[in-house]
Amino acid sequence: MRKHIQHRDFLLDIYIEDTDFQGFVYHANYLKFFERARSNFLLENGIFHKDLVQNSLAFVVKRAEMDFLLPAKLEDSLVIKTAIEKKSKARMIFYQSMVNPEDGKILCRGVIEVCLINLVTKKPQIFPNDLLLIFNKGELNE
């Protein structure tokens, strides 16, 4: 069992636009779904991408590992579990899994490393103090 610092669930319904000709979710869409869940995780904790961009900052994915275990299908209602597994002053490692709530089976899981960059210099940036306070004091909403 993985130990996580903070976590959040994101509900997801699968539509025809998400699937291939077989009715299975197209593999690239799992990254999109995980991105939505991470963005929702941040938004629910008062961390807004618009505010970061106004300060010439942005989160970028540095690394993504995905394991596709079972196919998600058209009209499935699923849960994406997002958790911060590890954090430092300039990066976070998220563990994410897509779960079928009916049977508890994991369909896909991923480890996503996210860094903060300065949009002017295009170089890694240490998290600003307000973000560090949220991350370090465990103030994320669970």
Where are these regions (language model features)?
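Compact nucleic-acid interaction/catalytic patches
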Residues: 92-98
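Hot-dog-fold acyl-thioester-processing enzymes
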Residues: 2-61, 117-142
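Beta-sandwich strand segments
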Residues: 105-106, 124
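Conserved GNAT-family N-acetyltransferase fold
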Residues: 34, 96, 110
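Hydrophobic beta-strand-centered segment that forms part of the acyl-chain substrate-binding groove
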Residues: 41-92, 107-110
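Solvent-exposed strand-loop boundary residues in beta-sheet-rich modules
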Residues: 102-104, 120
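Short beta-strand edge segments in extracellular beta-sheet folds
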Residues: 113-115
